[in-house]
Amino acid sequence: MESVQELIPLAKEMMAQKPRGKLVKLYVLGSVLALFGVVLGLVETVCSPFTAASRLRDQEAAVVELREACEQQSLHKQALLAGGKAQEATLCSRALSLRQHAS
């Protein structure tokens, strides 16, 4: 608030001294840049909840994908183990059947 109160006397003093064109252009440029910064700050403040929500959704989606990948890996491992056990059982039954025929 202090800076706004200081700007009004500064503007009055500048107008009383009849400033040169370059100085006025410089002050106008500074004012426009300051106003642009304020607008960007307001836009960022207004939009920040939406970006935080989208980040949270992205993180949740990544967690779900990781869980699905882990489940698929465990199912694949179980399938391999079950397939290996079935093959062993087949080989054992064949061996037993061969023994029965041989005797």
Curated annotation (Swiss-Prot):
<dbReference type="Pfam" id="PF15103">
    <property type="entry name" value="G0-G1_switch_2"/>
</dbReference>
<dbReference type="GO" id="GO:0120162">
    <property type="term" value="P:positive regulation of cold-induced thermogenesis"/>
</dbReference>
<dbReference type="GO" id="GO:0097191">
    <property type="term" value="P:extrinsic apoptotic signaling pathway"/>
</dbReference>
<keyword id="KW-0053">Apoptosis</keyword>
<protein>
    <recommendedName>
        <fullName>G0/G1 switch protein 2</fullName>
    </recommendedName>
</protein>
<keyword id="KW-0496">Mitochondrion</keyword>
<comment type="function">
    <text>Promotes apoptosis by binding to BCL2, hence preventing the formation of protective BCL2-BAX heterodimers.</text>
</comment>
<comment type="subunit">
    <text>Directly interacts with BCL2; this interaction prevents the formation of the anti-apoptotic BAX-BCL2 complex.</text>
</comment>
<dbReference type="InterPro" id="IPR016821">
    <property type="entry name" value="G0S2"/>
</dbReference>
<dbReference type="GO" id="GO:0005739">
    <property type="term" value="C:mitochondrion"/>
</dbReference>
<dbReference type="GO" id="GO:2001238">
    <property type="term" value="P:positive regulation of extrinsic apoptotic signaling pathway"/>
</dbReference>
